[in-house]
Amino acid sequence: TDSEPGAVILGFKASMTDVYAFPMTIGVRAHEPSDVMSKVRALEPSDMSKRAVAGMKEFYVRAEGIHGTDKSPVITARMKPVHSIGSVRAHFIDGKPTPIKVRAFGPITESMLDEHSMTIGRYEVIASRKYPSDYRHVFGMETSALDRVYAIKGEHRAFSDVSPTHATIEMESPAAHDFLYGRAKVDEPMTIRVAFHSTCM
């Protein structure tokens, strides 16, 4: 079903030089997947992002940690795209969100990519409220309070102990609209707000 993390999706890949601000792979789910895929393949790179996103029901994003290694924390997000001028909003299929904000930076390499995912080589996480212990473990144990805002950074740990499928993600920055339509630059930071369900697997 749509709520199952392992639901099968079709995917296509857009390289850094074609469409997106950095290399990424998006999995497409639609009522007529083969029709969507044929349309995606037929598009010119400059149009691929806009039309593919408009035709999607959901897609996956993965952000890996600072070093891009196996020990880096991983955020995997299954998203439903809803976009407007100047912002990108993607809502998870179900779950109770706990808002955080991820500011993602390049550079990203092809070797970091995996199917149905976008891998970010370096990131900074700022939480709007203090996380339960398990979430601090995932992102790193070092947390510092700035009023009600918490910067999370430090040691790396795999995301295998936490289910990331219940959440809300919102990407927003001056470049967010350009990113969606393939015009953002690799070195331009983008803010991604992420809300995770607090249930562990």
Curated annotation (Swiss-Prot):
Source lineage: Eukaryota, Viridiplantae, Streptophyta, Embryophyta, Tracheophyta
Keywords, alphabetical: Seed storage protein, Storage protein
Gene Ontology MF terms: nutrient reservoir activity
Assembly with partners or alone: This is one of six apparently different protein chains that constitute the peanut protein arachin.
Record-given protein name: Arachin 25 kDa protein
